[in-house]
A protein has these predicted regions:
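Class I SAM-dependent methyltransferase Rossmann-like catalytic core
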Residues: 28-61
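Conserved class I S-adenosyl-L-methionine
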Residues: 63-72
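Conserved SAM-binding loop of SAM-dependent methyltransferases across substrates and taxa
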Residues: 73-85
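Conserved SAM-binding motif I beta-strand of class I
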Residues: 89-94
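S-adenosyl-L-methionine
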Residues: 100-128
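A short glycine-rich, Lys/Arg-flanked "PGG" loop and its adjoining helix->strand segment in the class I
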Residues: 152-164
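Conserved beta-strand signature within the Rossmann-like core of class I S-adenosyl-L-methionine
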Residues: 164-172
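Core SAM-dependent methyltransferase catalytic element
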Residues: 193-211
Length: 211
């Protein structure tokens, strides 16, 4: 067997080992749900129809910083990157190190930043990356099942972190999230998407500060 053939076989074996080592995103999502059920909204990733409906109001041309809470395995992350401008940034924040490691390894995009941390610290996180405010923040975190005080802290920090005219995009399986976000946003639009498991309530909460 010549040296070229030996090298090809070696590369094939290495590729197969790498493939076996990489977890399928659905398995990774299920694993994250089992380890942190309070922090993951659903055992099944969001549908494509829900994703498009949730992101439809975004003004992508004027978006420089988009932040995502609880990205999981990137169900929303990838569509956001597809829609973003070349000079924009996406910061994904998750308390689950497994999800952050998976995304950092799986997504090769200079615009993407994966952060292991709490959404309650969003103001410090965006400052650490050179921004004063976010244009949009997206969340699928289950506010109604978060530990006491955490949901309120996240909602308040989010209200302060979003620029005037920006919005907090929230998809939930309980409408109670409105109680958390209403004190911090001047306008809230609401929708619903049946084609998702489970069906989800959607909120678009806008910052319209008085000058």
């Amino acid at each position: 067997m010549n040296a070229t053939r030996v090298s090809q076989l070696k590369n094939q074996r290495q590729s197969l080992r790498a493939g076996r080592g990489r977890k399928h995103p659905r398995w990774q999502f299920l694993r994250g749900f089992i380890k942190h059920p309070v922090m993951v909204g659903s055992i099944i990733p969001s549908s494509k129809i829900l994703i498009e409906k949730m992101l439809k109001p975004v003004d992508w041309q004027n978006t420089k910083l988009f932040v995502e809470y609880g990205p999981g395995v990137g169900t929303f992350t990838r569509p956001i990157l597809e829609k973003m401008a070349p000079d924009a940034k996406l910061i994904a924040i998750d308390t689950n190190q497994d999800f952050i490691d998976y995304l950092a390894d799986d997504i090769d995009d200079d615009r993407f930043i994966a952060v292991h941390g709490s959404a309650a610290d969003v103001e410090a996180i965006i400052r650490d990356h050179g921004f004063d405010h976010a244009d949009y923040i997206l969340s699928g975190l289950p506010f109604s099942t978060l530990p006491p005080g955490v949901g309120d802290a996240i909602a308040a920090a989010t209200g302060r972190a979003i620029r005037d005219g920006g919005a907090f995009l929230v998809y939930q399986f309980s409408p109670k999230v409105r109680d958390f976000i209403a004190p911090h946003f001047e306008k809230i639009d609401r929708g619903f998407e049946w084609i998702n498991v489970p069906p989800a309530t959607l909120f678009w909460a806008y910052r319209q500060r008085q000058h």
